[in-house]
Amino acid sequence: MKKFLKVIWGIFAVIGILFTVRVLFLLNGNTTISIYPSTKGRFGEYVELLRNSGPFSKDTVSLEMKIVQDSVRAKEIRDYFQLDKLYDADADTWTKALAIGKFVATNIPHDNQEIEPEHRNAIDLWEYTKDVAPAFNCRLHSILTFELMLAAGLDARFVTCMPFDRYDNDCHVVNEVWLPELGKWAMIDSDMDGNYASDLDGTPLSLREIREHYISGEKMQYHPEFGKATTKLSMHYAYMAKNTYWFNCWETLSYYQEDGENRLREAGRDIYLVPSGFDGFGIREGGIVTTDADAFWAAPRK
């Protein structure tokens, strides 16, 4: 009997040790053990890839980055989400964009959904979180945020941010909003609790500027959960270093952009911005590859 009890206590001891180790990993923000270096651990490698990449340069590809408004659909979305309660009517563009980003990030957590939504538009995605699953991935976050910004009268888009490594299956999708007050784009991420980047003066940065800061080594601040700024090597800081090697965006954007009901997607072009000397990979049929960063980040046309 004593031997039996000894075995039982031994089993409980092992379980206790494993539980303690598991808790320690969770407290440190890790949910799995990996034989590969973490994203933060590879930050220097990602920055070197950016620094060794070819420059962006003008080419012969003609681009017309365009945003198409639909007043009827805009009103439907404003009324459904009661957007006028999120911000003051006379607020500036960035204040409105932040309010929308916070709204999405607060209400919808990140997850890689097991069931794909039947429709990819703001209202149906919101209904999906109530009826099917409460969370979804970065692309769906960005589509929802894009349509809310568009309904609020903001010029916005969603951009796929991609790594150098063709065997890295992880990319990230974020939004950019055009700030007419500053004459520039600004990145805003409504996924993973929300985030944006700024220079040390607090001016929000575009994806182009974020990439340039990594290359130059100039300090910038990330604002996790749209809150207090930090220059520390956070997960976001390292993650975006990996995923700002090249970019993808639709040339023309509007509501229902990646929904079966949309017609613009069928006629629109898929634009890929790559550094010189890099061919990209996984380019969709009909996609346009360019090295012209000025055209890619030009003011949107209407």
Language model: regions and residue ranges:
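N-terminal Sec-pathway targeting helices
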Residues: 1-17, 23-24
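Cysteine-centered nucleophilic/redox motifs
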Residues: 14-17, 100, 104, 131-160, ...
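Membrane-interface motif at the C-terminal end of an N-terminal transmembrane signal
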Residues: 16-36
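N-terminal pre-domain segments of enzymes
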Residues: 34-44
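Secondary-structure boundary elements
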Residues: 42-136, 299-300
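Hydrophobic/aromatic-rich core segments of domains that either
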Residues: 143-216
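Low-complexity, Gly/Ser/Thr/Pro-rich intrinsically disordered linker/tail segments
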Residues: 216-302
